[in-house]
């Protein structure tokens, strides 16, 4: 669904006299801060998440899954992130944190490092915990907070 159409639908349609947008809760409400925005991602694993929450991964550090990125590709991603002022680098916690943090630091972006699966970090025991970790991490980064 087009992000503009979705937002327009939520603003225009009402339930009990209030726009649906005012009634959003949970992850969809929290995700409003990053819906329609661009991020860089470490790996293509975020395709379904980015589609569901309408946040675009404009480029990937690891362009070919399972193959470490070349220094040249990393430089291309850094240049793109600087040019487009991409504010967030979204990555799983099993990738090289030093590389993730270096790219974020060199671009002025915030690294949001999260588990990919349940039990991938302390306190992430259920799918609901996992989704909350992802959504809250991105929302915090877009609000200027630490992740």
PLM feature spans:
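Extracytoplasmic metal-acquisition and chelation regions
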Residues: 1-147
